[in-house]
């Protein structure tokens, strides 16, 4: 068992019954020229987050944790995104941006596009699981719950973008399904102003889960090897 120092209190888990969730580390969310950038969100500070996720993934894999990567998006015709009868049609900033800029149609969050791809620095390895998701929560219309339950996994460690949207949505849904969720705050990034990051982390540590950081996580898994991993 491993005890991780976190807020508001430490949490103990078995790494081999824990999954590291990497949420939407796609060009859309982390790279200039991607969806968030084109929609007016600041992605200029995502590079350290990518590096921290690399470090966390390496440590988690060495400890025997399952790594699950998510990619948010839809088919090239956006059928999966929903039409006017879906609130997603009205609230998705990607869909709204494409309606305002028709030349982007088919380029934002479309499966097979550069926007949809994971950033170059983050490459899933054999044994990892890569799943698509059509909405903010990684539990909605995906086999995530079944995958976790069949492996006896009850603890989830979250990284990715955006903290206040897809990361928080997934952790909340996991909480309702009786999963213990931990966010590594320096391996996440918000969509919007910095206060959105702070608010999301406050919500998580106060109501739904725990908050820690990459160095503490790596040190808890293998205190003697963190320097080598970093």
Curated annotation (Swiss-Prot):
Keywords from the UniProt entry: Hydrolase
SUPFAM superfamilies cross-referenced by the UniProt entry: Isochorismatase-like hydrolases
MF (Gene Ontology): hydrolase activity, acting on carbon-nitrogen (but not peptide) bonds, in linear amides
One Gene Ontology term from the biological process aspect of the record: nitrogen utilization
UniProt keyword annotation of Hydrolase present: yes
CDD domains (alphabetical): cysteine_hydrolases
E.C. code: 3.5.1.110
Main enzyme class: hydrolase
Inducing or repressing factors: Up-regulated by the nitrogen regulatory protein C (NtrC also called GlnG) and repressed by RutR.
NCBIfam families the UniProt entry points to: RutB
Function: Hydrolyzes ureidoacrylate to form aminoacrylate and carbamate. The carbamate hydrolyzes spontaneously, thereby releasing one of the nitrogen atoms of the pyrimidine ring as ammonia and one of its carbon atoms as CO2.
HAMAP family, sorted: RutB
Stated name of the protein: Ureidoacrylate amidohydrolase RutB
Species, as recorded: Escherichia coli O7:K1 (strain IAI39 / ExPEC)
Taxonomic lineage from the root: Bacteria, Pseudomonadati, Pseudomonadota, Gammaproteobacteria, Enterobacterales
Gene name tied to this protein: rutB
